Amino acid sequence: MDQLDLHLFWELLPLKGLGPIQFLSEKTDVQLYDKILGKIIAEEHENLEKRKQDLQDTVKQFSQFFSKEDLKIAIEALEETIGNERDDISTTFWGSGISLEYKADQLVEIFADDRAKLLHFQDIPIFSAEPIHLIGEISKQLNEIPLIKDEEVVFPKHHLFLFSFLSEQVDGQYCEGSKKNRSISWRNSPRTHAVNLADYQPLKLF
């Protein structure tokens, strides 16, 4: 791909995806971009039925220590923890700093860390721009006031989450966060088991 194509590829598109990769794309379609995304360095899978079976096998193996009631309680806890929303979830970690989460092999969330150096929002580099400028421009373009708590900035309507770009202070002010652990994620729908935003405060940038 030439530079223009790479620039278009690495554009963060809230509610839509990453460049040509749209939310709800099939995993096999996304893998066509492996030359840009880099090597797959790890994969994780969450499958409720498999976890149940693993639990049953463990209980059977150590039956002298566990009762049927213990198994029932453990499975109920597992169902509550994972639930239908987290069932059949897989995450692919790429060498470029991008992680892609799928539900039933359809893309539902994109995560990026500072290895994704070409990632940008409307020509503003995500990981090298001044955080206040970046978040301010995102706020303007999306016409949404972000919220902040500790080191997380959230654009709730656009399901966009920035971590460690800004840090909330005790006096209600904020300062630049640590560059070391900076990351960003975005979705086209609300997070499963979303954090209650009642404790988050509007971020006054202007």
Language-model segments: which ranges?
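Short helix/turn-capping signatures at newly exposed starts of structured segments
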Residues: 1-206
